[in-house]
Curated annotation (Swiss-Prot):
Keywords: Chloroplast, Plastid, Ribonucleoprotein, Ribosomal protein, RNA-binding, rRNA-binding. GO terms for cellular component: chloroplast; cytosolic large ribosomal subunit. Signal peptide: none annotated. The gene is rpl14. The keyword Chaperone does not apply. It comes from Cicer arietinum. Belongs to the universal ribosomal protein uL14 family. The keyword Zinc does not apply. Pfam families: Ribosomal_L14. This is Large ribosomal subunit protein uL14c. InterPro entries: Ribosomal_uL14 (IPR000218), Ribosomal_uL14_bac-type (IPR005745), Ribosomal_uL14_CS (IPR019972), Ribosomal_uL14_sf (IPR036853). Binds to 23S rRNA. One of its GO terms (biological process) is translation. GO terms for molecular function: large ribosomal subunit rRNA binding; structural constituent of ribosome. Part of the 50S ribosomal subunit.
Length: 122
């Protein structure tokens, strides 16, 4: 469950290292975001000499949450941290690699480019 002011790790090689959620895209009064939701975030930590700088506002899609994800067949997926992948306005990832296994639900939400870059799909 990601809400505004939540810190997230970045799961790709775009150059950002840590994000802070400032808004959840999709509804005017949504309180929480889950896996597959798009958020507006600000960069809190970045790698030097990359296109991103601190305090830059970006969009990201959530790929890992500490809150468990329950599927209809009874499987529960739970990660150790909260993480997101930086995307552009069209929904394509800015990085060229993704460092974690991601949930199958992202394929159903039309993030096929992120799914194809991931090393494993759970």
């Amino acid at each position: 469950m990601i809400q505004p002011q939540t810190y997230l790790n970045v799961a790709d090689n775009s150059g950002a290292r840590e994000l802070m959620c400032i808004r959840i895209i999709g509804a005017s009064n949504r309180r929480y975001a889950y896996i597959g939701d798009i958020i507006v975030a600000v960069i809190k930590k970045a790698v030097p000499n990359t296109p991103f700088e601190r305090s830059e506002v970006i969009r990201a899609v959530i790929v890992r949450t500490c809150k468990e994800l329950k599927r209809s067949n009874g499987i529960i997926i739970k990660y150790d941290d909260n993480a997101a992948v930086v995307i552009d306005k069209e929904g394509n990832p800015k990085g060229t690699r993704i460092f974690c296994a991601i949930a199958r639900e992202l394929r159903q939400l039309n993030f096929t480019k992120i799914v194809s870059l991931a090393p494993e799909v759970l």
